[in-house]
């Protein structure tokens, strides 16, 4: 299939080159002679040889992972792993979605523990392995099979659900491993090579190109800056490497878009620049420390750009400033538009949010801000992002949430002025599920305190421990109060 495609592509390429020649007999003669010295078959062999070299070099470092959950009711992955559907919650009861990640059907409570199967790759000779968080979260035991068939038990070193990255480790030495390239150097149209274990078919190599960069708002993870590729990524590829033509890791494969579950040419990978920083922290500290500014932001559209007299559509609009935060101390105000930091233009809200999250605490940055039509500079010292104790309390009752952004509200048909926290997944068989809580509902208040952000949630629940949690939940025009007790 690849050979046929390449032959066709090369025929067009060579034909186009000949058509573009000057209409001079001498020039045409020289070009024809050059083409005859380098026929299509030679070009095909060179391209094919490049792919096979990458496959030969990289495949031994790619591993097959089986993760056996602690409990019979496997924690359901966050909704984003299905990609940007018209309704983000359509896929929660889809059978293929469950099979994608080795999960049991939600229509029938599992009677035995089932493994989540995926891919990972070695990043050191002493057994550190990178994969997706959703492959190894809630695990009781992990089995890793190397390319040569050797099997090892693995331990979790660190998890980061916010980027869907994880590091596990096996006890061995002198193992083959992969190195990271720089995803910032990628260009749309560059070759991309994926290696993984789709449907359990180990060491499968697929080839495509970089289709796009900087994909976000897909609801796959909290921090998104995905590489889009048409290299075939299928169920079981999760956690595998996306490589450049030099065999360097440029991304970690994490999701596909597919109405039926099959490959349709749209896959997403976490860029190596983001992944490498997260992985280094997980290996070193077992957890991720993020930078914190303390603002709630809104993306800029054409209408807002005109209202705030911006020269183009860019930047991020400050809608709220957390009291006592670095932003508050520095003097940022509601309706400030952040257009640059440290001289780098803010192309989008997600780009700026990702950049701040990857900063070390105590990093000093200079923000360029548009305030009442004037451009000013504000120095800010980034602090460490607070721990999300409230999130942990909700997770113990089986709920996962995210902030309700204007984009998500619009997609779900929620009034733009609505304040609340969006429920994105509910663990089957959990306390929340048995109480009738479902994805797509909004948490309006917790313990009689109104909440409009995860920061509000954390402040309200920080002292809850194992006490009952009283939620005020809405779905459409229906509002209910639900009392939940976190499991020990």
Swiss-Prot record:
GO-annotated cellular components: outer membrane-bounded periplasmic space
Name assigned to this protein: Probable periplasmic serine endoprotease DegP-like
UniProt family annotation: Belongs to the peptidase S1C family.
Reaction(s) this enzyme catalyzes, per UniProt: Acts on substrates that are at least partially unfolded. The cleavage site P1 residue is normally between a pair of hydrophobic residues, such as Val-|-Val
Compartments where located: Periplasm
Organism: Chlamydia pneumoniae
Chain's role: Might be efficient in the degradation of transiently denatured and unfolded proteins which accumulate in the periplasm following stress conditions.
GO biological process, alphabetically ordered: proteolysis
Binding site for substrate: 236-238, 293-297
InterPro entries: PDZ, PDZ_6, PDZ_sf, Pept_S1C_Do, Peptidase_S1_PA, Peptidase_S1C
PDZ domain sequence ranges: 281-372, 388-476
SMART domains: PDZ
Serine protease: region residues: 119-280
UniProt keyword list: Hydrolase, Periplasm, Protease, Repeat, Serine protease, Signal, Stress response
Record-listed E.C. numbers: 3.4.21.107
Region forming the signal peptide: 1-20
A Gene Ontology molecular function term of the record: serine-type endopeptidase activity
Pfam families listed in its UniProt record: PDZ_2, PDZ_6, Trypsin_2
Active site, per annotation: 134, 164, 238
Keyword Nucleotide-binding listed: no
